[in-house]
């Protein structure tokens, strides 16, 4: 533990804890007193970090509306409003996106399948650009108000920056913007394929966000829509069980991968997917406080 004021490592732990059970510390260098959650994105939150992390996990993983989550937690005696869920989502999802993206940098295949689907934002249809590799792993997601050359270039530029990889093959539909965008943002030597049957893989993969998007009945703003779509696909990709030859695994194997992938793949340095605070989406670290 380091001091949040002067970043000194010479800190001492105090005997007493906060009302929610967080450990307290004192910096010997500057005298600053702080606890486990000080300086983090949930520093002033009125609820335990583990409860907030579980709310956001269920919000992203399952088909629940903003009003469903408060009702589910009210049964356990935890009371909060749907506006609190919206606020927690806005605070935590950017950090979660960054952490999940860092975990898969350089691990994406070199055969990409790119397509766009429709998402309604504030009553208007927008284009959600998505890409996966041959094994079904997520490459990148980007929401755009238009379907043109600028949007295609921005998507490929973002995908290359996120993955750190230049693909060998890119399969798309026959839209006019793709050939030039691929040559400009990726490489002139990248093989571009436009067969509609070859691109059926990504079209089937749209079912994930389409199924989750249905109960929400659209988004109110472009910012919240972009943030949610990116975080949903990143978490879905992280938890999706895959085999080398087929994406269909036995039920027991899928359950094991879902309940215990964190011990093998997550860092054990005390910070989980959401760093900079005591929040962790790692299931073994969920505990009552």
Label every PLM stretch briefly.
Residues 174-229, 234-237, 241, 245-246, ...:
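Helix-centered, glycine/charged polyanion-binding patches within enzymatic domains
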Residues 107-120, 130:
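Two-metal-ion RNase H-like nuclease active-site motif
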Residues 21, 80-93:
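Major-groove recognition helix of helix-turn-helix-like DNA-binding domains
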Residues 11, 27, 55, 69, ...:
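Mobile genetic element proteins and their domesticated derivatives, centered on retroelements
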Residues 215, 226-288:
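C-terminal domain-tail junction helix/linker
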Residues 16-61, 87, 107-112, 149-150:
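Basic, short loop/linker segments at the boundary and entry of helix-turn-helix/winged-helix-like folds
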Residues 42-49, 87-91, 141-164:
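Active-site beta-loop-alpha junctions of metal-dependent nucleic acid enzymes
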Residues 87-107:
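Short, basic alpha-helical nucleic acid-contact segments in DNA-binding proteins
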């Amino acid at each position: 533990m380091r001091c949040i004021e002067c970043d000194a490592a010479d800190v001492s732990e105090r005997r007493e804890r906060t009302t929610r059970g967080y450990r307290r510390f004192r910096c010997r260098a500057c005298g600053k007193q702080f606890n486990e959650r000080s300086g983090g994105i949930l520093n002033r939150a009125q609820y335990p970090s583990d409860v907030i992390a579980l709310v956001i996990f269920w919000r992203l993983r399952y088909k629940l509306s903003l009003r469903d989550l408060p009702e589910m937690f009210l049964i356990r005696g935890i009371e909060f409003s749907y506006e609190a869920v919206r606020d927690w989502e806005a605070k935590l999802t950017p950090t979660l996106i960054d952490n999940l993206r860092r975990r898969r940098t350089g691990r994406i295949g070199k055969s990409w399948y790119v397509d766009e689907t429709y998402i309604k934002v504030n009553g208007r249809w927008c284009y959600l650009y998505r890409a996966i590799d041959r094994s079904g792993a997520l490459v990148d997601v980007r929401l755009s108000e238009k379907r043109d050359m600028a949007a295609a270039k921005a998507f490929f530029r973002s995908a290359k920056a996120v993955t750190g990889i230049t693909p060998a093959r890119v399969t798309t539909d026959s839209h006019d913007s793709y050939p030039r965008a691929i040559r400009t943002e990726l490489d002139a030597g990248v093989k571009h394929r436009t067969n509609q049957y070859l691109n059926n893989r990504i079209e089937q993969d749209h079912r994930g966000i389409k199924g989750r998007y249905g109960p929400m009945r659209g988004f109110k703003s472009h910012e919240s829509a972009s943030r949610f779509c990116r975080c949903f696909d990143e978490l879905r990709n992280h938890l999706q069980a895959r085999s080398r030859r087929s994406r269909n695994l036995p039920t027991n194997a899928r359950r094991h991968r879902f309940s215990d992938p964190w011990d093998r793949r997550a860092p054990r340095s005390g910070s989980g997917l959401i760093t900079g605070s005591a929040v962790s989406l790692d299931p073994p670290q969920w505990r009552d406080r």
